[in-house]
């Protein structure tokens, strides 16, 4: 969406491997996330968006999942602050809590707390429920969960509405739309609020 916007003159894509986006505004930066702190961008950065995350199956261990979902995201936050970004929007997860007994929710909660400690001008945290949509890799458990949640969605009303699955594109729309709004400090968007975009 920033590629199509008049608000963004250039879009810097920070990636580990070459992407498929071809656009006159897009500038690709291939960087190892181990060396993220060395990233230099000469343009003035207004908005930074981070949707970095993995699964335990892909990571291979809780420690590796934490490295990606917490540590690399914190590193990205540090870099965006160093580059002078006005706003950082990051994807977390429903139930994120640094005190959770669930390793995934605890990792996401720790990531949120570490980003908040960076004292960024504006931090927007998006906590979607199960992310729906096409993936590069097969995730059988998520496919099953998506089918079940899809069938149950009409029943998930009121406070349960936040547990409805959310299309990844809808999260992206919410991140972009809120980047055009003025929020200072830390603002958390829960899954049911994301569904309104």
What are these regions (language model features)?
Residues 6-9, 98-197:
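Oxidoreductase cofactor-interface core, primarily capturing Rossmann-like NAD(P)-dependent enzymes
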Residues 19, 55-56, 94-97, 131-132:
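Short, catalytically relevant binding-site loops at active-site mouths
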Residues 14, 51-52, 88-94, 126-128:
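SDR active-site strand-loop-helix element
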Residues 20, 25-75, 79-82:
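NAD(P)H-binding glycine-rich loop region in Rossmannoid oxidoreductase-like domains
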Residues 1-3, 79, 114:
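Rossmann-fold NAD(P)-dependent oxidoreductase module
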Residues 13-20:
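Short, polar loop motifs at secondary-structure junctions
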Residues 59-63, 67-109, 117, 121-124:
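Conserved Rossmann-fold NAD(P)-dependent oxidoreductase catalytic core, especially the SDR/UDP-sugar
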Residues 2-4, 25-29, 43-44, 63-66, ...:
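Short, glycine/charged-enriched secondary-structure capping and boundary segments
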């Amino acid at each position: 969406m920033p590629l199509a916007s008049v608000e963004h003159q250039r879009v810097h894509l920070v990636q580990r491997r070459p992407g498929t986006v071809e656009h006159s505004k897009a500038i690709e930066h291939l960087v190892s996330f181990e060396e993220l702190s060395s990233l230099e961008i000469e343009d003035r950065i207004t908005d930074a968006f981070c949707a970095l995350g993995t699964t335990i199956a892909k990571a291979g261990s809780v420690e590796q999942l934490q490295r990606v979902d917490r540590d690399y995201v914190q590193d990205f936050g540090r870099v965006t602050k160093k580059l002078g970004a006005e706003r950082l929007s990051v994807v977390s997860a429903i139930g994120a809590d640094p005190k959770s007994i669930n390793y995934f929710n605890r990792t996401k909660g720790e990531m949120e707390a570490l980003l908040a400690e960076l004292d960024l001008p504006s931090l927007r945290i998006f906590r979607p429920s199960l992310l729906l949509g096409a993936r590069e890799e097969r995730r059988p458990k998520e496919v099953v969960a998506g089918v079940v949640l899809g069938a149950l969605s009409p029943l998930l009303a009121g406070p349960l509405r936040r547990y409805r699955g959310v299309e990844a594109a809808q999260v992206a729309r919410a991140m972009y739309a809120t980047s055009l709004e003025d929020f200072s400090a830390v603002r958390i968007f829960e899954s049911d609020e994301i569904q309104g975009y």
